[in-house]
Amino acid sequence: MMSTPETATEATAPEAAPAPSLGADAPAPLPSLIGLDRDKLGAALDAIGVRGSDRRMRVNQLWHWIYLRGATDFAEMTNVSKHLRADLAAAYSLARPEIVMEQVSQDGTRKWLLRFPADHPGERPHDIETVYIPESDRGTLCVSSQVGCTLNCSFCHTGTQRLVRNLTAAEIVAQVMVARDRLGDYPGRDRATGPGLPTEGDRLVTNIVFMGMGEPLYAYDSVKEAIETLSDGDGLGLGKRRITVSTSGVVPEIERLGAEVGPMLAISLHAVRDKLRDELVPINKKYPIAELMEACRTYPAASNAKRITFEYVMLKGVNDSPADARALVKLLEGVPAKINLIPFNPWPGTQYECSDWETIERFSDIVFRAGYASPVRTPRGRDILAACGQLKSESEKLSARERLALRAMMAQDE
């Protein structure tokens, strides 16, 4: 990853130090309770002999300490009996995923490279990236739902990494736990300081967006369970209006998401004609634009108060003409919508360039005059490859040639 003193800092958290190699006779790590929902916490208690009417109370206690207080040790749970704390510590842990790398951008954006254990002995562990984007009035955490991605969107860096597997609900929730740990975003913790952090309100992580690595609707069951845990008012307490699921257009799951879960919806659109979208977002060949837009018009959770966000990356000479803007306006008729125009963020090896600002502003003005909010998303975290479309979980740093190429691309956009 590119890092220069004036643009970014790179830090490895104390708990992120590489674990020593385990010998053949070394005990396996204890299973962690982090990220589990109430049913799974109940099952964990049942396994150590906590049953009957007592179990529900104990689940509520664990929920409070894990998700509201951010406990990292069972010893912190002072209203839980010493005997039960000992039993819990003997069978389980409160371990978070390993932080392999933490980077802080010059604009305050933070990116964590997180490592989950291998699924089977002898296999490689799984690395994913999570990004925190602070603003004065909010802090948005961009979480991943898959290790890699299968969509192969031509403008997206994640699409160059093969899909390994879906993340579990616990692994999705654990990303939020890590971010709140590192930011001190729990009662009684020392809050993080630095450029760009929210100055309003009492929370640093206020919003969650499923816009990291992977297609969330291909990991539907995990995403649904994770949202229920994240939105529980007795714990992390992130209301569903503060949780956005972004999809490239898995049409059959869009209605299901609205009916069963009801978060905010974002669509990675990026083109208004099937021929171009087939190239940019290949899933369009399976679910073309007409089918996608019909799913949006009937999305159960959509309303004027809960508009669907359409994401549109601005690619120089590809999809940024005034005719494209007018076609976008026509396409959105009948949909409660807003449009996020995203300046393309460069990454090594890409064939695309970002539209110039005059072109972006002209495009935005056409959409705005038609009655749609059309903010231009300010690029955040470009210097640490944390911006939209730049995530990729490989832990190896960029080669010198790739760093020079990236610097050149960024310089051209300034």
Swiss-Prot record:
The active site is at 129 (proton acceptor), 388 (s-methylcysteine intermediate). GO terms for cellular component: cytoplasm. Its cofactor is [4Fe-4S] cluster. The keyword S-adenosyl-L-methionine applies. Keywords: 4Fe-4S, Cytoplasm, Disulfide bond, Iron, Iron-sulfur, Metal-binding, Methyltransferase, rRNA processing, S-adenosyl-L-methionine, Transferase, tRNA processing. It catalyses: adenosine(2503) in 23S rRNA + 2 reduced [2Fe-2S]-[ferredoxin] + 2 S-adenosyl-L-methionine = 2-methyladenosine(2503) in 23S rRNA + 5'-deoxyadenosine + L-methionine + 2 oxidized [2Fe-2S]-[ferredoxin] + S-adenosyl-L-homocysteine; adenosine(37) in tRNA + 2 reduced [2Fe-2S]-[ferredoxin] + 2 S-adenosyl-L-methionine = 2-methyladenosine(37) in tRNA + 5'-deoxyadenosine + L-methionine + 2 oxidized [2Fe-2S]-[ferredoxin] + S-adenosyl-L-homocysteine. Binds 1 [4Fe-4S] cluster. The cluster is coordinated with 3 cysteines and an exchangeable S-adenosyl-L-methionine. NCBIfam families: rRNA_mod_RlmN. This is Dual-specificity RNA methyltransferase RlmN. The gene is rlmN.
